[in-house]
Amino acid sequence: HHTKFIAKQEGRNLKYIKKCFHVPLKGPDFETLKILKLIAKNNIVLNTGHLSAIETLILVKYAKKLGVKKILVPANNFDIATISKLKQFKVVFEFSYFFISRAINIPLTHVDGEKHKITGTNENKLKELIKEAEPKNVILSSDSGVSVLPLPHLSFYKFIKIIINFGFSKKEINYMIKINSKNLFNL
């Protein structure tokens, strides 16, 4: 948090929105390029954060050109076409319980005292997104560090039960909750 994309969703004022991070259509600005070069040089993970689909595609394209090898993309609100395009760059997709939980219906604070609702997704769409991304490219998380949800480990347990009900195998779930994270972060 905080990007122009999210600030616009939250209905923030224009003065606030202008100060937020974004990736221009022409490509990342000089400061962002410097950060991408540092990430590449140190072989650390780039988390693209809460950007729009087009911003994420642009950022990932530039990151790969600069040698960034490990990219984590929060993808709960993307469509199948965006997931398909991002797969070409060999990113890891993150899907979290938060975006299908009741927390999306409750105004919450994130970066300041203002309360806003977050755009979520539904379980059917989530299942299709994970299928498109493919379990070997997915990390599941609870993202449950808000007071209206159960403790993160309990939320994660609930999320895993939902994923099991989607029909993913134990092997696929093992990739999504353990193996992919270990590989991405060299653990």
Where is each model-derived feature located?
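Divalent metal-binding pocket/active-site signature
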Residues: H1-I80
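Short acidic/histidine-rich active-site segments
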Residues: P135-L151
